[in-house]
């Protein structure tokens, strides 16, 4: 049975989340998901378009995960709760893929740049909604998201060399700063 584009994209995204984006080649990916490289090209037109679609699909999944996190009693506890979610699957792998795309220089150039910017806007909106659920005032939530998103991304990168327990104090310091912004 032939897969439609959406099902194929889900399977390729699952494969890339498990095996990584760096060194992605069409033939091995096609074989792993039970199709041919020609079918991937038929559905996605190029390797670049496939990679862009995979990164976007992983971002969609990450956004759904953030939307499912219950609001916390305070912005501080919300930052710590979000950090805990960053360390769990599937969110951790989605963030890893974004890091890999950035590390390979994909996100900073077309055809990825426009898709990455659009995806980042939706990601930031999901974080704004989350922090509003945690009590952040509307007029300050964008500032909180800018700080927290960039910092947690950095902490996530640090997980490659540091243990979560080693980073938790820095994350809580970040959470205190975000709470201070929220309370003005």
Predicted regions and their residues:
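N-terminal intrinsically disordered/low-complexity leader segments
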Residues: 1-3
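Helix-turn-helix
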Residues: 7, 11, 15-49, 53
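Solvent-exposed, amphipathic alpha-helical segments
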Residues: 11-19, 64-65, 97-104, 151-158
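Residues in soluble alpha-helical coiled-coils and helical-bundle/repeat scaffolds
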Residues: 45-49, 53, 70, 103-110, ...
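Hydrophobic alpha-helical connector segments
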Residues: 53, 64-95, 144-148
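Generic helix N-cap/helix-start motif at coil->alpha-helix transitions
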Residues: 59-60
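Short secondary-structure transition hinges
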Residues: 80-128
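Hydrophobic/aromatic-rich alpha-helical bundle segments in the mid-to-C-terminal region
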Residues: 92, 109-118, 132-184
